[in-house]
């Protein structure tokens, strides 16, 4: 937020782009008008209208007194789904077989985007783009790799 304010104070009027730490509400309260029109990438947006996201949001709100799930909730859910899928494919919870099944995860439908693990076990999935518009975070699009 402070970098955005400084950029605006220096006369920079270009759109600014940040990472997933920008989703903190303090960005809006501290940055004010300086963050208007900025963008950031993250893992998830409850505004995404994909069936996986809308179903997750509905179930979460029903379970947690109408609270809207944040990115950490979505990532935690997806991690549990990767594990459940790997257990099912491995047919066991034996550690070596489970490790291999997790490593073999490919295009698993997920709330944060279809998940594929590469040879180094890094997740490859969509990046979600959010814009700050009228003082609010707004979903723009999910960009698949």
What is the predicted function of each stretch?
Residues 1-145:
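Extracytosolic ligand-binding ectodomains
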């Amino acid at each position: 937020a402070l970098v955005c304010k400084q950029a605006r104070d220096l006369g920079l009027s270009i759109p600014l782009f940040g990472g997933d730490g920008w989703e903190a509400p303090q960005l809006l309260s501290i940055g004010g008008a300086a963050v208007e029109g900025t963008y950031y990438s993250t893992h998830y947006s409850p505004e995404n209208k994909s069936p996986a996201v809308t179903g997750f949001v509905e179930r979460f709100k029903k379970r947690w007194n109408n609270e809207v799930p944040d990115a950490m909730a979505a990532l935690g859910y997806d991690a549990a789904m990767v594990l459940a899928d790997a257990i099912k494919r491995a047919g066991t919870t034996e550690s070596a077989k489970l490790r291999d099944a997790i490593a073999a995860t490919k295009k698993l439908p997920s709330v944060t985007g279809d998940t594929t693990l590469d040879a180094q076990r890094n997740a490859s999935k969509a990046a979600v783009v959010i814009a700050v518009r009228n003082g609010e975070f707004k979903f723009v699009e999910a960009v698949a790799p």
